[in-house]
Amino acid sequence: MKRIYLLLSLLTGCLYMQAAIYNVRDFGAKADGKAIDSPAINRAIEAAAQEGGGTVYLPAGEYACYSIRLKSNIHLYLEQGARIIAAFPEKDKGYDMAEPNEHNKYQ
C-alpha cells in the first residue's frame, strides 16, 4: 500500500513539474517577416522565466528580430518552417550594445 501511495505521489508531482509552453503568437508575434517580433519573443521568454522556465514555441513563419534575451531554464522550439531573421536597425531602434568581455569586445 505504501508503494502505491508513493508511486501515485511521484506521478502527480511529475505532472505538475512539466514546464509550460509559451506560444509567441499569444504574446503578439506576427511572423510575417516585416513586423519586429523580438518584443513578443522577449515577453514570452520573460513570462516563462517568471514561472521558473518553460518552452518558448515559435510556429512556422518568419520572425524579424533585434536582440533576443534568453534566460535560464528557457528552451526555444522552432517549428519546421520557422525562421528568425535579423531585422535592419532603424535610427532609434535596433540591437543591444555588446557587453564588456575580458577576452574581446564582442559578446
Task: List where the protein language model places each region.
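Extracellular/periplasmic carbohydrate-active domains that bind, remodel
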Residues: 17-107
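Bacterial Sec-dependent N-terminal signal peptides
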Residues: 1-22
